[in-house]
Amino acid sequence: MTIATAPAPSPTPTPVRTAPRLTSGHLKRWMPWALLGASIVLTGLVFALVAVAGDTGFDLTGWLVVSAIVYLVLITLISGLVEGRRKAVDRFITGIVTIAFLIAMIPLVSVAWTVIANGLARFDALFFSSSMRNVVGEGGGAVHAIWGTLLITLAAAIISIPIGLMTSIYLVEYGEGKRIARGITFLVDVMTGIPSIVAGLFAYALFALFLGPGIRLGIMGSIALAVLMIPVVVRSSEEMLRLVPNELREASYALGVPKWLTIVKVVLPTAIAGITTGVMLSISRVIGETAPLLITAGFTDSLNLNLFDGRMQTLPVFTYTQYMNQGIPPEAYVDRAWAAALTLIIIVMVLNLVARLIAKLFAPKTGR
């Protein structure tokens, strides 16, 4: 007797679970920009309708803020639906960082635009070729203030850069762990935060001891600015010197090179780009000072190229005096003040460009 056995049922195949994808789609490259434009246009229409209905002015600040909020909401929701939660969070954070950057740029762009728009009225050849001697009302220029700014700042740099650089070399190369180095660092940190007027009073008191009260000299202004520059040069140069790898120093010592020559030939060339940037930052910090120069260098309407004889005027002081001592017509004085401010900004920009060029030329070459 043959017994037929039914075949065993085959096991039900277990469905293979696919790993979840990080993103289920991707927004087109133009989509974020389209959402930004739509947010700006739609909120602008709403604010315009509100302004017309309420007979009020257009709220520019509110429009920009609401546009940013609407954009963040839209880009997060749409990205979450199309690309997934991870990408949506990434786009949300990117939007916040971008908006923060734009907000930080608003004051800079506003200041630059205001100075350029108002300073071009007197940005002419007469402004750069004449002084204010015997000038009342319209006309005149700021050639005496431009030369005063350059000479006083140059003298301050000549005084402060060697002192600051040598101090930073001592702190990094010779004073590591010493008590005197800690004391110098503490004093430098304190000097970094002193008000500029204190530096002016110090320079005035120093020269008044030898030349009597009431003295005003260009070199006094240079001393005051040097006091403000030294701590900035020290701190920036110190940080750059500490970034030089110790392996470079040890390799030089292994070849029998003395310490001072290692500093000159290895350490300083390696850090020259950062040191130059720090020096230019210190110059940019002091070139616009007004209070210490009012006390030390004073102000004058004539051109004076001698730092050790007579008063000198700088562009910040020229701007202050023109704005505060307006005559008839007042527009002429205000225009000269704006032109001086624009000239000062251009000088700072040129100095920074020169610093970048110097840093690029003298930076250590990489590669073979």
Task: Identify the role of each PLM range.
Residues 12-25, 49-60, 76, 80-99, ...:
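Periplasmic/extracellular loop-to-transmembrane helix junction in inner-membrane transport proteins
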Residues 26-27, 90-95, 163-203, 230-239, ...:
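Cytoplasmic-entry segments and transmembrane alpha-helices of multi-pass inner-membrane transporters
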Residues 63-71, 140-169:
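Transmembrane alpha-helix signature in integral membrane proteins
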Residues 159, 236, 257-297:
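Transmembrane alpha-helices
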Residues 173-174, 241-245, 251-261, 265-271:
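Short helix-to-coil transition segments within interhelical loops
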Residues 189-225:
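Generic hydrophobic transmembrane alpha-helix motif, especially the helices
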Residues 241-242, 246, 253, 324-368:
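C-terminal transmembrane helix and the adjacent membrane-cytosol boundary/short C-terminal tail
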Residues 293-345:
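Interhelical loop and adjacent transmembrane-helix boundary motif
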